[in-house]
Curated annotation (Swiss-Prot):
PANTHER family: N-ACETYLTRANSFERASE 10, RNA CYTIDINE ACETYLTRANSFERASE. Residues 356-531 form the N-acetyltransferase domain. Coiled coil: none annotated. ATP binds at residues 180, 202-211, 319. It is found in: Cytoplasm. Disulfide bonds: none annotated. Keywords: Acyltransferase, ATP-binding, Cytoplasm, Nucleotide-binding, RNA-binding, Transferase, tRNA processing, tRNA-binding. This is tRNA(Met) cytidine acetyltransferase TmcA. The keyword tRNA-binding applies.
Length: 671
């Protein structure tokens, strides 16, 4: 085939230039497969094949691709004929050696947007795959507008365009690149203070941080949201690498000459400020775009609090030439570019709502909204883009300035579960997909029917750093109330900080839940709050807030931190307590979900109850209790704790306990 000869010649040119390209094969399954095999046979390479089906020797499923990160391949096939895992696609593009092709297999071009996408099962909260027309149309726009991407469609004439030769590329040798070396010298001679290094993926910022640690005369501590993500840093730091998780570091009195925070944007600013203040020198690194998260907006906000912060940026890719067509195409397709943060929105702010259909008629607006949200929220992934475009029940508001988007709000429909399902969720018998806050209100709250109410959860909210402190966030929430009808509440779940809670409180939200353990990645407790919109919503918020006040002292003792509520000193078992205790004793409600009422039960009961008292009153560990009580493990300990709760309830009121037991055990049987 003349096409293959031309591709062979172009591949050699790409290798000299240090770039990769995308080649799309769109057509019927057999046609795509046959042409991919012909390419594999014509162009020598590894030909990693990413597909849910076992189509080739060097095969890997999209979900297992993470296990290959850090390795390099020449040429790969990404099979998206039945579903498009956007994160896997982006990750695969980053594993390719310079001079490689990424061959993308797609359905028949004209049929693609109406075809159910199997990947939607991961993010749509739907029981069956759904069509994803907005994402498909967006990707088609990007592919057809990209002069460097090659589109080969079945039953369409194909000719390979002529590509103007680029400058020859000189690959990295393993030593620090000139850009890295210059930055490294500046860091090594930096006076006490804070430095921040930002970079897109593949620019060597983790290697730079590791090289810094290996060369400093003193000691360093590394912290990050996840230790597994610091492997490259550890490799370059060598024996001087020492990792402590953010929450553990905050609780300790460890000292060092340097604190290195990898992917700092993933750590809440209040926690980061506390950590930074304890060390004479700090290096923060963060990704400004990529499939693993983005942090440009966070960094702008953080820099505002440190006016003397030293800012550096790595721009030169390590494993391919700058301006690589494949990297550029992936960035556009998955909206990794968050450069909007560099433009300050001007003029008066106007709040308006829009729905997903705007992706068809005016895609620039939702694109800018997504860029703002992803820049402000570090853990924004390609999966979030797909959800925003095509998942059911998504709603949006924008705060538009004259030239740019100044703020954005993303809301998700929740609740409306049947009475039977809500009761089963409350008892711990069922955990259906989605409904984050609605399910939590039932599973961790006092009302078995809480999930029957209909709410709308704040999934994301962001205001451009240059337009903050102007009330724009509150305007967006007020706009959500104005544009929302026939619902019981707005809800929000967030990592608790005093500053964040003051914002939600000013918006009218009522605190209804506080978690009982810190998230290791953030060092924060999870908080949930409601803004009632109906009488039923108001009753639910009042009931759960009252429960939180009753449990406040118990939670404060357990968490070691006071709650922002007025505690009630009430040791009497209420009707809600009896119901919750029966849910723990005879169903599957978790121990710590029932912390307050269990402690009140222990105050009321005269029985020994060693498994419960040992854990909740004496703070013995599960391992200690298993040894003392001669139990085989945590599961058996929990069984014993449930048995003890049942014994205590029967001792207090046998008839009432039997009635509650019979009622609750029926909740696991429904259609």
């Amino acid at each position: 085939m003349a096409e293959l000869t031309a591709l062979y010649t172009l591949t050699a040119q790409m290798k000299r230039e240090g770039i990769c390209r995308l080649l799309v094969l769109s057509g019927e399954e057999g046609w795509c497969f046959d042409h991919a095999l012909k390419l594999r046979d014509a162009l020598p390479g590894d030909w990693l094949w990413i597909s849910p089906q076992l189509d080739a020797e060097n095969h890997c499923s999209p979900s297992a691709l993470q296990t290959l990160l850090g390795r390099e391949f020449r040429h790969a096939v990404f099979d998206a004929r039945h579903g498009f895992d956007a994160a896997a696609f982006a990750a695969l593009s980053g594993t390719l050696k310079a001079g490689s092709w990424l061959v993308l297999l797609l359905p028949v071009w004209e049929e693609w947007e109406n075809q159910p996408d199997a990947d939607s099962l991961r993010w749509s909260d739907c029981p069956d795959p759904i069509a994803t027309p907005h994402f498909v149309q967006h990707l088609k726009r990007v592919l057809t507008a990209d002069n460097d991407a090659i589109l080969w469609r079945q039953n369409q004439p194909f000719s390979l365009a002529h590509f103007t030769p680029r400058t020859d590329w000189h690959p990295a040798t393993g030593a620090p690149q000139p850009e890295q070396q210059q930055l490294l010298q500046q860091l090594l001679t930096m006076p006490p203070g804070v430095a921040a290094v930002t970079a897109a993926r593949g620019r060597g910022k983790s290697a730079l941080a590791g090289q810094l640690i290996s060369r400093i005369a003193g000691s360093a501590i590394v912290t990050a949201p996840a230790k597994a993500a610091t492997d490259v840093l550890a490799q370059f730091a060598g024996e001087k690498f020492r990792f402590i998780a953010p929450d553990a570091l905050l609780a300790s009195d460890e000292q060092a000459d340097w604190l290195v925070v990898d992917e700092a944007a993933a750590i809440p600013a209040p926690l980061l400020h506390q950590l930074v203040s304890r060390f004479p020198r700090t290096l923060l690194t963060t990704t400004v775009q990529g499939y693993e998260g983005t942090g440009r907006g966070f960094l702008l906000k953080f820099c505002a609090r440190f006016p003397h912060l030293h800012r550096f940026e790595l721009q030169q890719p390590i494993r391919w030439a700058q301006g690589c067509p494949l990297e550029k195409m992936v960035s556009e397709a998955l909206v990794f570019n968050d450069e909007n943060f560099t433009h300050t929105p001007q003029g008066n702010i106007v709040i308006s709502a829009f729905e997903q259909t705007l992706w068809r008629s005016e895609p620039e607006t939702p694109l800018k909204v997504y860029q703002l949200l992803s820049g402000a929220h570090y853990r924004t992934l390609p999966l979030d883009l797909r959800r925003m475009m095509d998942a059911p029940g998504q709603h949006f508001l924008q705060a538009a300035g004259e030239n740019e988007i100044a703020g954005a709000l993303w809301l998700v429909d929740e609740g409306g579960l049947s009475q039977e399902l809500s009761q089963a969720v409350w008892a711990g018998f069922r955990r259906p997909r989605g409904n984050l806050v609605a399910q939590s209100l039932a599973a961790h709250g006092s009302n078995p029917l809480a999930a029957t109410l209909r709410g709308r959860r704040v999934s994301r909210i962001a205001v451009h750093p240059a337009r903050q402190r102007e009330g724009t966030g509150r305007q967006l929430i007020a706009g959500a109330l104005q544009y929302t009808h026939d619902l019981d509440y707005l809800s929000v779940s967030f990592g608790y900080t005093g500053e964040l809670w003051r914002f939600w409180q000013r918006c009218g939200f009522v605190l209804v839940r506080m978690g009982n353990h810190r998230e290791a990645s953030s060092g924060c407790y999870t908080a949930m709050a409601l803004l009632p919109m109906s009488d039923a919503g108001k009753q639910l918020a009042e009931r759960e807030h009252y429960r939180l006040r009753r449990d406040a002292q118990a939670l404060a003792q357990w968490n070691g931190e006071m709650l922002p509520v007025d505690p009630l000193n009430d040791a009497i078992l209420s009707d809600d307590d009896w119901l919750e205790l029966a849910g723990f004793a005879f169903a599957h409600r978790p121990l710590l979900t029932s912390l307050g009422c269990l402690l009140r039960l222990l105050q009321t009961s005269e029985l020994a109850l060693p498994a419960l008292r040992g854990r909740l009153q004496k703070n013995a560990s599960d391992a200690q209790l298993c040894t003392t009580l001669k139990l085989s493990g945590r599961k058996m300990l929990l069984v014993r704790q449930r048995e003890e709760a049942a014994q205590a309830l029967f001792a207090l009121n046998e008839v009432r306990t039997e009635r509650l037991r019979d009622r609750i055990t029926q909740w696991q049987f429904f259609h």
